[in-house]
Amino acid sequence: MHSVTERGGMSDNPDFGTFGRFVETPVAEMDADMKSAFEFTRKLRGQVPGPHKIWPANPTLSHTIVPTGAYFQTESTLSKGEIEIVTSVINGHWGAAYSNYEHEKIGEQLGHLPAAKVTALIAGLPTSFDDARQQVVYELASALAATRVVPQGLFRRAQELLGDKGIVDVTVLMGWFTGVSLTLMAYDVPSNATGLSQ
């Protein structure tokens, strides 16, 4: 096995690898199952970002969960802005440095959300949206992240504006990014992590 420094690790500290605490395996050294999971992710996503660098360590699970993330990239009933509202609310709740840093940029650049609103979402500060769908997505995600009851009035508005498909998209997206955040937190992945270029 290569040492962390031979693999381009963050430091000589044995507690850290190439991506936070995780020591990535170069593609050429992966066993068949791990390589299959890695390539499956690259095919679906076009790259192997963030926690996807870690998940091939459990190839069967990786094959199972990666399509969920890909669904939100291409087939969700939510707009990219709405997805980033949910993502910033739940990432902010968990406090994973890497995902908050990445999605602060993504929310602004790809979600077309105002910078002040994205930072408020991540920080758990109150904000609001002129678009009724974005507002109800924000309220629903905030209530769920705060482990509060979703009041009947909020649920009715969400059902009117998003439908049951949209509500399910919000809840499953929150679960997805909870998994993302907890993976990144367990491996202590810092906001400036890059990992191996492969």
Residue ranges of model-derived segments:
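Hydrophobic alpha-helical segments
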Residues: 1-198
